[in-house]
Amino acid sequence: KKITQNKSQGSVYFMEAFTNRINLGGKQARYYDLSHFNQPLDSSSTPRAPAHFYSGNSFTVGTYTPLLSKLATEFDISSLALRGYWYDKPQSRRLTREQDADMLIEFLEKTQDNPVVGIGHSQGATATAMAAAKRPELFSQLYLIEPVTFTKNQATLYNLLPRSVLLSREPFKSTLTKQSTWPSIHSYYESLRAQRAYKRISNKHLQVFAEQSLSKNTDGSYTLMFAPEQELANYFG
């Protein structure tokens, strides 16, 4: 159950300073220990409850920094990244929420001594709910933000649709043509700002989103940490 911390130097991305590695299912997974966000506890203070945050598809943990920095004042937070940007990236064309739930269960078994507050967004919320249904003793409470849910009939119909049909519809269609490499953080920010989906996000928070979505290449360009092909595989799940 050895857990090692990433000691890479020179990162300009704040959240990456809290990156760790752990072996899950025989793969090198990425997770974040955000306990250092917390200010020192007074001796008279009640210890913060352990919590886990599971992000949505295509969103790195760092893109949630404004939210997580606030949650960290109340909770000792860890966050397992979705498999799309683990160190050992999946090769499957279909990544399911059941698999994400199983990875979360293994992660909590290896890192936690007490039940955690499960917090999740979108597909991460769905996987958190599934994990809690399988292993309720691992969780003390759940906070689910916009979980992706289907009725039984909807799920049956969805699974019967041919891959070619799904690829002609959103969000599959736009993910297929999503630009993954950018000349600068600013160019990616400007692209996001022009999109309707990000209209209500403040300039400050959108800047954080842009910065935390990208990794710098040796030639000075930037690449999305969560690759579109991995995002697509999650949608098929």
Mark where each language-model region is.
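Polybasic, lysine-rich low-complexity intrinsically disordered segments
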Residues: 2-6
